[in-house]
């Protein structure tokens, strides 16, 4: 399969990355070894998903490249994700120090991310183990255990 973007891992960051790339017109494939996506999301926050923190700020992250964090958080803030949560009518509450949790189940966040991926026409490859990634002149080749 040919794609403009291959995202390895269908966790929260992987699904969000795939969704945004797809919605920006890229052909995206999202590959995960698990057959059921979002397992870590499903168990986070005791099954209620701690989906963001209102107090996220660049000075609260350690990085070899502090400019990356400043840029990333300036372009997509916790408020942006909260707006998406509200568009999907997911009830939430603040538990402690800006930590936001679903009132219901973490499944709601997984469903939100799946729908955002669908809106970007993301192709799914679940139950697929990545054997290696190879740099080639045209980009990268992702070799799976099925190749």
Place the predicted regions along the sequence by residue.
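A conserved short coil-to-beta-strand element within the FAD-binding core of flavoproteins
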Residues: 126-139
